[in-house]
Amino acid sequence: MKKIKLLLVAGACVVLSACSPQAPTVHTTDKGTQWEWNEGTIVVKSPERPAGQKSVIGLTAPKMEVVRVGFVGLGMRGPGAVSRFTHIPGTQIVALCDYDPKRAEACQNILKKASMPKAAIYSGETGYEELCKRDDIDLVYIAADWLHHFPIAKCALENGKHVAIEVPSAMNLQECWDLVNLSETTRKHCFILENCCYDWFEMNTLNMAQNGVFGEVIRAQGAYIHNLSDFWDYYWKNGENDKLGWRLEFNMRHRGDVYATHGLGPVAQVLDIHRGDRMKTLTAMDTKSVVGKGLVEAKTGSECTNFRNGDHTTTMIRTENGKVIEIQHNVMTPQPYNRLYQLTGVKGFANKYPTEGYALGADQLSASGVQPKVDNLSSHGFLPQAEMDALVEKYQHPILKKYGEIAKEVGGHGGMDFIMDSRLVYCLQNGLPLDMDVYDLAEWCALAELGEISMDNNCAAVEFPDFTRGEWNVVKGYKHAYASPEEEQASMEKAKAFTAKLKERGAKEWATEADK
């Protein structure tokens, strides 16, 4: 009898054990990201907001009559940024930093040409640390190699500086979360330098979408398709033994869309991401590496057995509100440059590459304020040139009206770089929220590691982290911020007066040096 009771108790324990919920298995990636399965979807562990820490949605800083800037990274993109800032009133270039002191010194010639005073020079692996400690810098503009974006930004934020970071601004989820937390704790801006949000077609189309020209936009595409075969040798190499350069080596070691922001940024603004909608689920798929693998073998003379980044990567995202985003990445195969930028609305369609055009029916075009000049206008084809020109003229973005002409003169990827820099300075001078915040940065840069996790698990669905921590629906609709005409005029007058005096000083300093 006693034996029977023991057997019954043991059996009951087995049943209870089998029926009790088991803790899900926690997996850890090589980047330290923890995730687990939940009903067939991968859920990445996200940190809670620490007590006392607040969101920076809509963050503003006190107005700055003058924006004092330190530039870090003066290789391929940095010098162009220095040059553009000499054309923006109310800015002062205080310091220049690069690993190679010759590159930093070379940018003094840009200042000389613009009659701007010399800047302080910093160099070496950690030269940026001293730059960030200066008390006469408001903004640190970062255009270094990808792996240095985060440590430089972290140092700048910890030293009380606003930061503007070239793309991709963060290379993994941990860096995304760290920048979110740093911006929230320091109350400093963390701006992603995504220039493609300021290109002409994208800005005008955004304005059309916000005014209902396409109806509800339910699907969007973006991409970075750019054959870099002519550029691989121009990326910085760390000594004679470095045969690949930093960018090719990063592609070799990392799977996923490592350069997603050019394609994702503009369409995320159209879809009001974390301003009424959010990216909810992601899945990614890539081809095998053929060109990338071959490049490494040609440059090293050794077999490459594990080139992680596929020659072409496609990432699909579903939003909370049932929209779909498709983002592509290909820097390997021969084909024309292409960022796709395609919007599918319930009443119209927009497409940038390879042919710019809009497709609207006659009724929708009329409802959008443009009267068709042809009979039987149909959305089966793009608008005729006259109708397209009229639509673009009606919905030309206010920012393009303000900066477009001078941007074409100054340049920088056709002018969009100058518009981006000008808007950054404008918002700082007028104490406004920036066009992109740290949550944009984190969301757009997160595609790389999230896609890698998806593909390393048979292209499984991955839940997208909510970097706003539940506040993605607080703001209704993406909007650019503007000062009142009176405030804008007062700010610009002060900016121009400062720059005029600065150039007088600079011209005297350079003349004195020439006389030595």
UniProtKB/Swiss-Prot annotation:
Lipidation (S-diacylglycerol cysteine): C19
Secretion signal span: 1-18
One of the record's GO cellular component terms: plasma membrane
Membrane topology designation: Lipid-anchor
Cofactors (names): NAD(+)
UniProt keyword annotations, A-Z: Cell membrane, Glycosidase, Hydrolase, Lipoprotein, Membrane, NAD, Palmitate, Signal
Pfam families: GFO_IDH_MocA (PF01408), Glyco_hydro_109_C (PF21252)
Gene Ontology molecular function, alphabetical: hydrolase activity, acting on glycosyl bonds; nucleotide binding
E.C. code: 3.2.1.-
Disulfide bonds: none
Chain residues carrying a lipid of type N-palmitoyl cysteine: C19
Binding site for substrate: Y224, R247, Y259, A260, T261, H262, Y337
Record function comment: Glycosidase.
Family: Belongs to the Gfo/Idh/MocA family. Glycosyl hydrolase 109 subfamily.
Protein name, as recorded: Glycosyl hydrolase family 109 protein 4
Organism the protein comes from: Phocaeicola vulgatus (strain ATCC 8482 / DSM 1447 / JCM 5826 / CCUG 4940 / NBRC 14291 / NCTC 11154)
